[in-house]
Curated annotation (Swiss-Prot):
Interacts with MKI67 and TPX2. Plus-end directed kinesin-like motor enzyme involved in mitotic spindle assembly. It comes from Mus musculus (Mouse). Keywords: Acetylation, ATP-binding, Coiled coil, Cytoplasm, Cytoskeleton, Microtubule, Motor protein, Nucleotide-binding, Phosphoprotein. One of its GO terms (molecular function) is plus-end-directed microtubule motor activity. ATP binds at residues 109-116. GO terms for biological process: centrosome separation; microtubule-based movement; mitotic spindle assembly. Residues 368-1132 form a coiled coil. This is Kinesin-like protein KIF15. Residues 1-23 are annotated as: Disordered. Belongs to the TRAFAC class myosin-kinesin ATPase superfamily. Kinesin family. KLP2 subfamily. SUPFAM superfamilies: P-loop containing nucleoside triphosphate hydrolases. InterPro entries: HMMR_C, KIF15/KIN-12, Kinesin_motor_dom, Kinesin_motor_dom_sf, P-loop_NTPase.
Length: 1387
């Protein structure tokens, strides 16, 4: 910047509002054009500019042959004020920092383009209070005003901590400006903090004034120096960082937000030929240009990465780019101010700055809120649970406002239909993808099979060719082989051919694939024929049709309901859709698993039912047979019983007869004799003789009665034993019959099963017979083939000998081939190892070549950019020089014409002199004295003319010298152009050499790629044998993974179902609790709500009255302001009507000062009204807290009433029990069964019951009263809730009014700042006008003193020209003033 330009940079008002763009987190680029200095005017009074502003977002660069147009986010002209720049650029960044985002603002441009003035302001005054202060002081003011506003709104629940650090990057070293004793600091990187400076001082600040003190203290330590382009040129990059930490407490949780605001003043790029830097300044300029070129390379790489290219971003090549890494391509919102110089001599730097800004505009960052939540773990868990429940309630549609319930109910069906349609669409897409994958796999499988079959066919063909060759050899040399050898050879070869054919035709994988394919087709056909699958398809088709119909209806009705807006915000809708989709996905997985399980269960059930049906049929037939057998047995048993009864009757009659006959008695007697005399046993012979003699005597004797009784007893005992034995045998017989029945049933089952098996066997026998017949036919065919083979064998036996010889030779060749193959395999393995090593080396070389190629491309791009800039600069300078040359030629022509006129005057004077001399000679004699006088006057005039001629000749010599100087300048410019051409040719040669080297390297890369492809082909060929086994393993792994996946899905579906059930249970319990709490709340807010309503209504009326008063005052102030502006316009108009007056109106300055004082007083009044409104809002908040406490107290009272209600219920139950006991006692008294003490006890109990009944009646009355009170409280609570809702709406409205008033206040403040800047500008212009008037007064005095008429005329003409110029300037200023007033009226 030229000397003194930083302090003399003037701006005028530009009424652009701060309209944030909706381009996400893209880097915002703003261009500011600095005004040209006063010394940059040409000879004709006009300035030579290379820029022109077309609109607020576009500017034009006057390049040759065609001008270039650039588009940016905002273009600030030469008359833009500091306040408009701040409101456009920095306000949104500061507000985002208050919201928790990182923000960065930095100025870029050449040296002397106004970067420091834009960021800081004038350098020779107090920047913090100056009207022309820059972005950094204004950012401090706005930041702390926002902090104070947040503190007033939140009270003690929110606190802020601001810390400042100030560093500079000087000669690629980092220094701390707040610590003058610091040496080179280091940069470090942290995962959360990002890039930071180790050891930098951070100072806490609490106000904008403290922050500015820290800034000014560090600014004094910054390195600045003077150059030919700027009086105070920044020699380092300065970064001022403000760390903003906000801590918000809510119950037991603490929400912490941290953000960084980086304010960067970059050093300007410069050229040595412009700044004439030497020594240390030249080294500093080299480091500055190097860091700025690294910044340009980083931005180019970021643009390429944003366009999808793979590029390395060289952040670490410079300390500046590494420090600004997050600001350029990370977590920050960034604004770049590109400062440019409009002068034509800065065309090259202006063009490079605009190209840099245009590239930076394409970068997009990803800014996020830096937020951390701390607090009690249980409290956080409860908060998370509450939010989840609220989210579930929102998604389920339970929490909806009363005004939108109907619309939400109408939309639920549409949402469900839409989600189902999306699920069907996703399902169809997934099925389509799976089918496409299966098709591709099957195609790959068929290709592999075809390749395998072709290879095997080729092997068979080679073998057959070998056999044909051996046959031909055998025919040529018939009889050389023995018949046994020929047979053996032929049989071996035939066997080999047959095995190969079988290998081709009956490959196990082919058979496996065919079987799998067939089974899959059968399974698919069977599943399609199942009734559930058909039903599912039909249901899907019906649901799709229903969804399409519903979607059409909703889409038709949605156009009619566009005016209505949903209550739930977009985030809630998205969350509800997300949760619904998750639940529907889980349900879909569950239904799919259930479908698979039902299919499996259906198959198992089908098999079981078939088996059970067979068993039941067999059991039925066996039971039928058993039933018939049992009926037969029953009839047989009846017949047997009849026979047994008849036999028993007969036996009984016979026993009676036997008992009554004497033979029986005799037998009894004979049985009793040996019992009575046991000694007779030794004398058996004598007894027999005696018994034979006594037979007749015993028979004739009568039977004694004792013996008959004994005989009866013995018979009865024997009958009893027989009956017992009979009963035991009967039981055994029954058991045997049951066993026989069971066996018979089993036999029947087995017979039925055997019949079924026989039927199966018969069907199988028929099949077997058919197969046997087929085998017989095949056997006959095989016999025929055997006969043919025998004939062929006989034919081929003659060739066996030759084939054996050939086989021996083939074996020898095979052994040689095996040896060659082993050696080839070893060599191949060695080559593979070498090729793998070479592959690695080639890959490394390729990577190195790629990196070198990228570097060369980057350098080529940089050279191309510099070449283009040089071309543009050269064209622009050539154009300027050609214009200067034309001007010089025109001046030379004018000087030549003036010289010719002077020569003609000189000749005329000579002729006059000659005439006078002749006249003198003629009149010499007549009037010598007069002639002498005349001669003397002529001589004087001649001397004057000669002096004039000498002056003209001196002017001519000066003009010739200037012409020679211009010619020398032109020659030097031509030489510089030739040197530039030589530089351009050198650059072109370098580019050509680089292109040649790139071509050579690309050729080497191509050869390396070809070698790499050959190596890959060999490597792939060597690995082809391993792919089949890997494929089998992969398939097995895929099967295992599929089984695991199905198991995991089943487990997941069960877990999801369990979680859903748990959530439903928790939701139901929560709803129950909420209902109970709501009933409690509704019962306790009557009196407080009424008082609150009356108070709030009065307060609202008071606030509305004050608001109306404020609006009237604002309108009155606006009217006064417009009136004063009209007065100012009138004063300015009166000032411009008299441009030649040497004095200004005396009352103008005082009137303007009074006007500004009144405006300041009005602003102070507005601030006071704002503070009073804020106090009212705080009072309202305090009242609200008091009412919340009263609500809590009423809740406690409601809890007590609920406890009383429970106690009354318990007493009612006790009363009922006692009433029953009393009734029992009365019944007992009436019966009279109880004794006297019991009756006394009953009397006591009766008295107690009476007392309890009275107490119960009292409690019932109190309960009824409480119920009535509760109903009244509930009704009052309902009305109070409505009032509270109205109050909350009123509070929201007051908040919006407060925010609107804050915005209006900020707009008024910015307008006031612009007015201050305009006042400064008008004061400066008035001073200039005063100086001009004083100068005119002096010149007027001089004009009065002049006596020569020619001089007076020239002076008056010059004054008229000056007067015309001044009137034109005043007209321009008046037009600008009118334009600004119209803009203000629009606001």
């Amino acid at each position: 910047m030229a000397p003194g330009c930083k302090s003399e940079l003037r701006n005028v008002t530009n009424s652009h509002s701060n309209q944030p763009s909706n381009e996400g987190d893209a880097i915002k680029v703003f261009v500011r054009i600095r005004p040209a200095e006063e010394g940059a005017r040409s000879a004709d009074g006009e300035q030579s500019f290379c820029l022109s502003v077309l609109s607020q977002t576009t500017l034009r660069l006057h390049s040759n042959p065609d001008p270039k147009t650039f588009v940016f986010d905002y273009v600030a002209g030469m008359d833009t004020t500091q306040e408009s720049v701040f409101s456009t650029v920095a306000k949104s960044i500061v507000e985002s920092c208050m919201s928790g985002y990182n923000g960065t603002i930095f100025a870029y441009g050449q040296t002397g383009s106004g970067k420091t003035f834009t960021m800081m302001g004038p350098s020779d005054s107090d920047n913090f209070s100056h009207n022309l202060r820059g972005i950094i002081p204004r950012s401090f003011e706005y930041l702390f005003s926002l902090i104070d506003r947040e503190k007033e709104k939140a009270g003690a629940g929110k606190s802020f901590l601001c810390k400042c650090s100030f560093i500079e990057v000087y000669n690629e070293q980092i220094y701390d400006l707040l610590d003058s004793a610091s040496v080179g600091l280091y940069l470090r990187e942290h995962i959360k903090k990002g890039v930071f400076v180790v050891g930098a001082v951070e100072q806490a600040v609490t106000s904008a004034a403290e922050t500015y003190q820290v800034l000014s203290r560090g600014w004094r330590n910054r390195r600045v120096a003077s150059t030919s382009m700027n009086r105070e040129s920044s020699r380092s990059h300065a970064v001022f960082t403000i760390t903003i930490e906000s801590m918000e407490k809510s119950s037991e949780t603490v929400n912490i937000r941290t953000s960084l605001l980086n304010l960067v003043d970059l050093a300007g790029s410069e050229r040595q030929k412009d700044t004439h830097a030497e020594g240390m300044r030249l080294k500093e300029a080299g480091n500055i240009n190097r860091s700025l070129s690294c910044l340009g390379q980083v931005i180019t790489a970021l643009v390429d990465v944003g366009n999808g290219k793979q590029r390395h971003i060289c952040y670490r090549d410079s300390k500046l780019t590494f420090l600004l890494r997050d600001s350029l391509g990370g977590n920050a919102k960034t604004a770049i101010i590109a400062n440019v110089h409009p002068g034509s001599r800065c065309f090259g730097e202006t063009l490079s700055t605009l190209n840099f800004a245009q590239r930076a505009k394409l970068i997009k960052n990803k800014a996020v809120v830096n937020e951390d939540t701390q607090g009690n773990v249980s409290q956080l868990q409860a908060e998370v649970k509450r939010l989840k429940e609220q989210l579930s309630q929102f998604t389920s549609g339970q929490i909806t406002p009363e005004s939108l319930l109907a619309r939400d109910k109408e939309k639920t069906n549409y949402i469900e239909y839409f989600l189902e349609a999306m699920l069907f669409f996703k399902k169809s897409e997934q099925e389509k993808k799976s089918l496409i994958e299966k098709i591709t796999q099957l195609e790959d499988l068929t290709l592999k099979k075809e390749k395998f079959i072709q290879s095997n066919k080729m092997i068979v063909k080679f073998r057959e060719d070998q056999i044909m060759r051996l046959e031909r050899l055998h025919k040529e040399g018939r009889g050389s082989f023995l018949p046994e050898e020929q047979d053996r050879l032929l049989s071996e070869l035939r066997d080999e051919v047959q095995t190969l054919r079988e290998h081709v035709e009956h490959h196990p994988r082919l058979a496996k694939y065919a079987m799998e394919n067939h089974s899959l087709r059968e399974e698919n056909r069977r599943l399609k024929l199942l009734a559930p699958v058909k039903r599912a398809h039909e249901i899907d088709a019906q649901s799709i049709a229903r969804l399409e119909k519903a979607f059409a209806e909703v889409s038709s009705t949605e156009t009619n309901d566009k005016g209505l807006q949903g209550f739930s915000p977009k985030a809630l809708k998205e969350s509800s859709f997300f949760t619904n989709t998750e639940k529907l996905k889980a349900q879909l997985l569950q239904i799919q698993t259930e479908l698979n399980n039902s299919k499996q269960e259906y198959e198992e059930f089908k098999e079981l039912t078939r088996k059970k049906q067979l068993e039941l049929e067999s059991e039925l037939q066996s039971l039928q047979k058993a039933n018939l057998n049992l009926e037969n047995l029953l009839e047989a048993t009846k017949v047997c019983k009849r026979q047994e009864v008849s036999q028993l009757n007969k036996l009984h009659a016979e026993t009676l007869k036997i008992i009554t006959t004497p033979t029986k008695a005799y037998q009894l007697c004979s049985r009793l004799v040996p019992k009575s005399s046991p000694e007779v046993g030794s004398f058996g012979f004598l007894c027999t003789e005696s018994s034979s003699r006594l037979d007749n005597d015993i028979l004739n004797e009568p039977v004694p009665p004792e013996m008959s009784e004994q005989a009866l007893e013995a018979v009865s005992e024997e009958l009893r034993t027989v009956q017992e034995q009979l009963s035991v045998l009967q039981v055994k017989l029954d058991e045997e019959e049951r066993k026989n029945l069971k066996l018979q049933q089993n036999v029947d089952k087995l017979e039925h099963h055997s019949t079924q098996m026989q039927e199966l066997f018969s069907s199988e026998r028929s099949d077997w017979t058919k197969q046997q017949q087929e085998h017989v036919t095949q056997l006959s065919d095989l016999e025929k083939q055997l006969q043919d083979a025998q004939t062929k064998n006989e034919f081929l036996k003659c060739e066996v000998h030759d084939l054996r010889i050939v086989l021996n030779s083939a074996d020898k060749e095979l052994s040689l081939v095996k040896l060659e193959y082993s050696t080839f395999k070893e060599n191949h393995e060695k080559e593979l190892s070498q090729l793998s090593e070479r592959h690695v080396q080639v890959q490394l070389q390729l990577d190195n070549a790629r990196l070198e190629n990228e570097k060369l491309l980057e350098s080529q791009a940089c050279l191309q950019d510099s070449y283009d800039n040089l071309q543009e600069v050269m064209k622009f300078e050539i154009d300027q020089l050609s214009k200067n040359l034309q001007n010089c030629k025109q001046e030379n022509e004018t000087l030549k014409s003036d010289l010719h006129n002077l020569v003609e005057l000189f000749e005329a004077e000579k002729e006059r002199n000659n005439k006078l001399s002749l006249q003198f000679e003629e009149d010499k004699e007549n009037s010598s004295k007069e002639i002498l006088k005349v001669l003397e006057t002529v001589r004087q005039e001649k001397q004057k003319e000669m002096a004039k001629c000498e002056k003209q000749m001196a002017k001519i010599q000066k003009l010739e010298e200037s012409l020679l100087a211009t010619e020398n300048v032109i020659s030097s410019l031509e030489k510089s152009r030739e040197s530039d051409k030589e530089l351009v040719t050198n650059l072109m040669n370098q580019i050509q050499e680089l292109r040649i080297s790139i071509g050579e390297k690309s050729e080497t890369i191509a050869t390396l790629k070809q070698e790499l492809q050959d190596i890959n082909c060999k490597y792939n060929a060597s690995l082809a044998d391993k792919e089949e086994s890997k494929e089998l393993i992969r398939r097995q792994e895929v099967d295992i993974l599929e089984l695991k996946e199905t198991l995991r899905l089943r487990i997941l579906s069960e877990d999801i179902e369990r979680d859903m059930l748990c959530e439903d249970l928790a939701h139901a319990t929560e709803q129950l609790n909420m209902l109970t709490e709501a009933s409690k709340k509704h019962s306790g807010l009557l009196q407080s709500a009424q008082e609150e309503l009356t108070r709030k209504e009065a307060l609202i009326q008071e606030l509305q009255h004050k608001l109306n008063q404020e609006k009237e005052e604002v309108e009155q102030k606006k009217n006064e302001f417009s009136l004063k502006m009209r007065q100012l316009e009138h004063v300015m108009g009166s000032a411009t009507e008299y441009p030649q007056s040497p004095k200004t109106p005396p009352h103008f300055q005082a009137h303007l000062a009074k006007l500004l004082e009144t405006q300041e007083q009005e602003i102070e009044d507005g601030r006071a009204s704002k503070t009073s409104l804020q106090h009212l809002v705080t009072k309202l908040n305090e009242d609200r807290e008091v009412k919340n406490a009263e609500i809590l107290r009423m809740k406690d009272q409601l809890c007590e009433m609920e406890n009383l209600r429970l106690e009354s219920q318990q007493l009612r139950e006790k009363n009922w029990l006692l009433q029953r006991q009393l009734d029992d006692v009365k019944r007992q008294q009436e019966s009279g069964d109880q004794s006297h003490p019991d009756s006394q006890q009953l009397k006591n109990e009766h008295e107690e019951i009476i007392k309890e009944r009275l107490a119960k009646n009292k409690l019932i009355e109190e309960m009824l009263k409480m119920k009535t009170n509760l109903e009244e409280v509930q009704s009052a609570l309902h009305s109070k809730e409505k009032a509270c809702h109205r109050m909350s709406e009123e509070i929201e409205r007051t908040r919006t009014l407060e925010s609107r008033a804050f915005q209006e206040k900020e707009q008024l403040r910015s307008k006031l700042e612009e007015m201050y800047e305009e006042r400064e500008r008008t004061f400066l212009e008035m001073e200039m006008l005063k100086k001009q008037l004083e100068f005119l007064a002096e010149e007027n005095g001089k004009l009065v003193g002049h006596q020569n008429l020619h001089q007076k005329i020239q002076y008056v003409v010059r004054l008229k020209k000056e007067n015309i110029r001044l009137t034109e300037e005043t007209e321009k200023l008046r037009a600008e003033n009118l334009f600004l007033k119209e803009k203000k009226k629009e606001f």
